[in-house]
């Protein structure tokens, strides 16, 4: 698939998610009580639970989540630049942390939560706002009882 076709598909995916999602906010404990990670994400995608504010702040959102796998999509802007004129590494890290964290959360039963224990990224190419869209994929490698391991990657429509 060519980059232009991929970009068109990504934009359609994002439009579909944006058309269904709820208000920006944080779900109350009574709203998520009894929901597994996947049930919680489905409720977010259906607009029954609020969309977390971090995505609004940094201009990214989840576009697909299934057990053990999550895809986020975003558009870096000038507000995300560092002093060198490229996208700040924290933007990369936050989007990747969201993808791998949600991949882990998607396999958790009701009543269980997660937090990031360690995050390491390797940035192999600078990113600017000239990139139309970027995706972050997170995948669970090992779903341990106490500590899960996940990996992620960030890429554009050209791969």
Predicted regions and their residues:
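Terminal targeting signals and extreme-terminal segments of soluble enzymes
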Residues: 1-159
């Amino acid at each position: 698939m060519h980059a232009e076709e991929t970009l068109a598909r990504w934009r359609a995916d994002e439009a579909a998610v944006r058309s269904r999602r709820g208000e920006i906010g944080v779900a109350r404990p009574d709203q998520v009580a009894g929901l597994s990670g996947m049930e919680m994400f489905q409720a977010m995608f259906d607009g029954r639970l609020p969309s977390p504010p971090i995505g609004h702040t940094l201009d990214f959102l989840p576009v697909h989540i299934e057990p053990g796998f999550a895809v986020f999509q975003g558009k870096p802007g000038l507000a995300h630049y560092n002093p060198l004129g490229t996208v700040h590494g924290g933007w990369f890290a936050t989007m990747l942390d969201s993808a791998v964290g949600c991949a882990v959360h998607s396999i958790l039963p009701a009543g269980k939560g997660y937090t990031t224990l360690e995050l390491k990224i390797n940035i192999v190419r600078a990113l600017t706002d000239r990139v139309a869209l970027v995706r972050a994929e997170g995948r669970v490698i090992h779903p341990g009882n106490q500590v899960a391991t996940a990996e992620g990657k960030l890429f554009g429509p050209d791969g």
